[in-house]
């Protein structure tokens, strides 16, 4: 998988070791919002727009915490480093102050969109194949952005609720041109929901 070889440390070292280039390293989180080519909200939003009664999450993935940042706020952090001489030679982590679990993330998207469904956590073996995470979610991905806040005065201009709202509006108007329809096997999901209702 591409993510197994995804590492920018060597590039960071190359830039920071060049004395003639006053480089600054910014380590960004998962960036969401307008122009998100990975369409991070899409799997959840499509189900909400399709008025699905539930978003089913693998239990380990539901608890996983991953840092995020709204694209507008991340752009401000980048601009701050460009114009502030103090940033030269520095390494800064940038992320929202609070890191949500995947479940909390889906619930926040749902709240902003007025979705009346619920998030249901299930073990991997009880989920349809299209919803099995296929990753080890034991390790959270959390960034501490204290340094850029203290040294450069960074703070989010766009609050999280407003950011999610703007991102959701963009995502709903800009579905990916191509996507795997197998991601949305509603028949299999309905079978799981029917089984749960009988339990």
What would you call each of these model-derived segments?
Residues 149-180:
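A contiguous, mid-protein "functional segment" used to position or interact
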Residues 1-25, 40:
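Active-site Tyr-X1-5-Lys
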Residues 21-45:
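Flexible, glycine-rich beta-alpha linker
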Residues 77-140, 145, 178-199:
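Mid/C-terminal beta-alpha module of Rossmann-like enzyme folds, strongest
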Residues 47-69, 77:
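A conserved pocket-lining segment of Rossmann-fold NAD(P)-dependent short-chain dehydrogenase/reductase
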Residues 33, 57-64, 92-99, 136, ...:
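Glycine-rich Rossmann NAD(P)(H)-binding loop
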């Amino acid at each position: 998988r591409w993510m197994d070889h995804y590492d920018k440390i060597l590039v960071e070292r190359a830039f920071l070791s060049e004395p003639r280039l006053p480089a600054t390293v910014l380590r960004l989180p998962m960036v969401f919002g307008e122009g998100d080519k990975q369409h991070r909200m899409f799997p959840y939003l499509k189900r909400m727009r399709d008025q699905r009664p539930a978003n089913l999450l693998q239990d380990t993935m539901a608890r996983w915490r991953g840092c995020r940042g709204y694209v507008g706020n991340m752009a401000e952090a980048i601009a701050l480093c460009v114009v502030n001489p103090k940033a030269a030679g520095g390494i800064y982590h940038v992320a929202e102050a609070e890191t949500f679990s995947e479940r909390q993330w889906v619930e926040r998207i749902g709240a902003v969109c007025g979705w009346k469904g619920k998030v249901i956590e299930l073990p991997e073996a009880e989920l349809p194949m299209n919803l099995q995470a296929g990753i080890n979610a034991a390790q959270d991905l959390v960034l501490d952005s204290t340094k850029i806040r203290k040294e450069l005065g960074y703070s989010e201009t766009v609050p999280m609720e407003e950011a999610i709202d703007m991102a959701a509006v963009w995502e709903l108007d800009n579905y990916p041109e191509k996507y795997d329809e197998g991601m949305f096997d509603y028949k299999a999901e309905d079978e799981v929901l029917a089984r749960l209702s009988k339990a």
